[in-house]
Design a protein with these regions (language model features):
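Intrinsically disordered, low-complexity segments enriched in small residues
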Residues: 1-109, 113-385
Length: 385
């Protein structure tokens, strides 16, 4: 067992109209854990999500703060609609910090279970400040109202291994794994300024941990600089009204309309449920907007080799729900299952590749002059983990 450095107990707040009314502050350097009130002013002026992130970041930093300054914060928040199950896109977490790439505030929008589970555990936002002396893990049990900070020296470094281990560690059984979400970054974040964060969710159909990424601005680099190995949250008992919205009847009515529109129109317009955001590859190529060979051109005659249809026909599992939160009929979090790696430290293994998103297909494919879907997916996996 890892050495426990700090424990903290709290009474989980009941969600009222999308808010718990509390935020969680953790200083990973001196191990302080504090509760802060979410005021009516904050809700009125900043709403939640990125608004709350920027509010807390504004009060944490100075004009002299750099990305690797101890006072720089990583702030995470799900807005007042976070975690509702009536329509798509509500599993989002908004993450902000001073970026190592720009030296100004950056925000990144990520799917998965962490934001909703954090909110239902009683927290509208999470602030992480300071720097730990050694790698640590932070675990929040939202049902028991218990927070643990412990040493993390014995854990794998790469996210696909780390999240699998932590999901199994904190889940009581196979059925309980859907109640656990892990935030982590991989070994690359120690060496580059563009490191990103993986937000996990457990896929009970595939029986594997999957990821969405907060990939903008180098958030994973800050995470590793603070010596945070992983954040883990656990909450079970999700229901359709856990968010306790102000007007559930209207929410249900709007949700039904929303689901019908996606069902009727998606195949005609975007094919998000078949390919996700990579549906735009050939559209961008057609309009001379596909970044190719380091933006020398806006398209290429070989672009068809990484077209959406190639990924749909040859790589991405079809006919299975791919939402990254309950009730998301957009179902755009596509996956290449049992994908055989040919290179790198995991060569010969079959892995789950989350993607490709458009940014991966364009950035790791066309923009590098690579029009090989196998190579794009392989790079996708290694960039993620």
């Amino acid at each position: 067992m890892s050495k426990i450095l700090k424990e903290y107990t709290y009474t989980p707040a009941k969600i009222d109209k999308g808010y718990s009314g509390k935020s969680l502050y953790i200083h990973v350097g001196d191990l302080r854990i504090e509760e802060k009130e979410v005021t009516e002013f904050m809700k009125e002026k900043f709403v939640g999500g990125k608004g709350f992130d920027l509010w807390y970041l504004w009060h944490a930093v100075t004009p002299e703060t750099r990305w690797d300054s101890p006072e720089n914060e990583i702030v995470m928040s799900a807005g007042p609609l976070g975690g509702i199950t009536q329509y798509s896109g509500t599993g989002k977490t908004l993450v902000c910090a001073i970026s190592p790439l720009t030296d100004i505030p950056i925000d990144s929008n990520v799917g998965g279970y962490y934001g909703p589970l954090l909110k239902f555990s009683g927290w509208d936002a999470l602030e992480l400040q300071g720097k730990a002396d050694k790698d640590i893990l932070i675990f929040i049990d939202g049902n028991k109202g218990h927070i643990i900070i412990e040493e993390a020296d014995d854990l794998p470094e790469d996210s696909h291994l780390l999240a699998e281990e932590l999901t199994s560690r904190y889940a009581e059984n196979e059925q309980d794994k859907v109640n656990v979400s892990v935030v982590s970054t991989g070994s690359a974040a120690k060496h580059v300024l563009m490191g990103m964060l993986n937000f996990s969710f457990y896929d009970p159909r595939r029986k594997t941990v999957r990821f969405k990424q907060a990939a903008r601005g180098g958030l994973g680099t800050i995470f590793r600089d603070k010596h945070i190995k992983a954040l883990v949250v656990k909450y079970k008992g999700i229901k359709g009204d856990t968010n306790n919205p102000a007007d559930l009847a209207t929410l249900n009515r709007v949700g039904i309309k929303y689901h019908k529109q996606m069902h009727d129109l998606d195949d005609k317009q975007n094919a998000m449920r078949k390919i996700g955001t990579a549906n735009t590859i050939m559209v961008m190529d057609k309009y001379d907007l596909l970044p190719t060979r380091n933006f020398q051109t806006g398209g290429d005659p070989d672009a068809y080799k990484i077209s959406p249809q190639v990924f749909i026909n040859e790589y991405l599992t079809q006919g299975i729900h791919d939402g990254c939160w309950y009730g998301c009929t957009m179902s755009c979090a596509k996956t290449a299952d049992h994908f055989p790696l040919k290179t790198g430290p995991y060569a010969g293994q079959c892995v789950t590749v989350d993607g490709p998103e458009y940014e991966c297909a364009a950035g790791l494919g066309a923009n590098l002059g690579i029009f090989d879907p196998q190579a794009v997916l392989e790079q996708n996996f290694y960039c993620d983990t």
